[in-house]
A protein has these predicted regions:
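Surface-exposed, flexible loop/turn segments at secondary-structure boundaries
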Residues: 40, 61, 126, 168-169, ...
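Hydrophobic/aromatic beta-strand patches that form the interior of the parallel beta-sheet core
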Residues: 30, 54, 119-121, 159-163, ...
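Short, conserved catalytic or adaptor-binding loops enriched in Gly and charged residues
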Residues: 110-112, 152-153, 220-225
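Short coil/turn segments at beta-strand junctions that form active-site/ligand-binding loops
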Residues: 26-28, 115-117, 156-158, 227-228
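PAPS-dependent sulfotransferase catalytic domain
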Residues: 120-219, 242-257
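Aromatic-acidic/polar surface patches that form glycan- and anion
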Residues: 25, 35-36, 113, 127, ...
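The conserved 3'-phosphoadenosine-5'-phosphosulfate
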Residues: 63-71, 187-205, 219-290
Length: 290
């Protein structure tokens, strides 16, 4: 008689027979590549709402030294103009992230994945150094460049989704208001007409340079690496958010019919439009970037 033994059973995901019968491939994990105020939050929240397209978050924004995303003044570290800096909240201390690189990766993968195995996340170009630093602590590295780092952290078969905004001035105005108010998410509440944010051409100009450079860097990276990617413009996303999300779902091998109505509302208002027009006029007169 065999001795009694306790067995630990590990659950294994069942094969998706619908995909097998239809000839479709398994759905792909993905990374949204963007810059701040480009509309990427609307896209990832739409994908999250499907419950099958990962739980995309901006996982790479948190600084290991503080466990916080960059604070308003950290966006302006090279700026010495006190009329700009005085409009931004002072730095607040944080708590150092003591997780190992492997612990950080494992948690990131667990949180970002839906039960069907699809992982989703979002990366801004200014966060690339954080990705490289985190990946440097992983064992058995495949290389030290960004593509290797993403492969070592995430997956070798990632789909890349590039979200961009043609009107960088409007994007910078949106970010300039956000760094002052520290309200980054759109919701059902209309923006307050007097939210405490103040117009400053040099503050906006600083962000125009940053945001324009971020998009240039993404485009250069895709070209240099020869990476196929999905291009999503802010204009298309805002004009037809549900249809745009459906397009992305198809590209990921998921059901387009799962695309939800837009879960967020735009924060832009008449005040932002006034600032955009004012900045364009002052930029033309004073040689500020457009």
């Amino acid at each position: 008689m065999f001795p009694s033994r306790k067995f630990d059973f590990v659950p294994i995901a069942a094969p998706n027979f619908a995909l097998i019968v239809s000839g479709m491939s398994e759905p792909r994990s993905y990374l949204v590549c963007a810059s701040q105020r480009s509309g990427s939050t609307l896209l990832v929240e739409s994908l999250r709402a499907t419950t099958v397209a990962g739980n995309p978050e901006e996982f790479f924004q948190y600084l290991p030294s503080t466990s916080r995303s960059p604070q308003p003044r950290q966006w302006f570290e090279s700026v010495t103009d006190e009329t700009v800096l005085s409009l931004l909240a002072p730095l607040e201390p944080g708590t150092a992230d003591t997780r190992t690189a492997e612990q950080w990766r494992d948690q990131l993968l667990s949180v970002g994945r839906t039960p069907n195995g699809v992982w989703g996340g979002k990366l801004m170009w200014n966060q690339v150094p954080l990705v490289l630093d985190r990946a440097a602590g992983l064992p058995d590295r495949s290389g030290d460049d960004l593509r290797s780092a993403l492969g070592d952290i995430l997956d070798r078969d990632l789909a890349f989704i590039h979200v961009y905004r043609r009107d960088v001035v409007a994007q910078a105005v949106s970010m300039w208001r956000a760094v002052q108010t520290q309200v980054w998410r759109d919701d059902a509440t209309p923006p307050a007409p007097h939210d405490g944010a103040e117009y400053h051409a040099d503050g906006i100009a600083h962000l125009v340079r940053i945001l324009r450079d971020q998009d240039v860097q993404w485009r250069n990276w895709f070209e240099t690496e020869g990476l196929d990617h999905i291009d999503i413009s802010f204009d298309d996303l805002v004009a037809a958010p549900q249809a745009t999300a459906a397009k992305v779902l198809v590209e990921l091998g998921l059901d387009a019919d799962l695309a939800p109505p837009p879960p967020l509302k735009r924060q832009s208002d008449g005040r932002s439009k006034e600032w955009v027009e004012r900045y364009r006029s002052e930029a033309a007169a004073n040689g500020l970037p457009l």
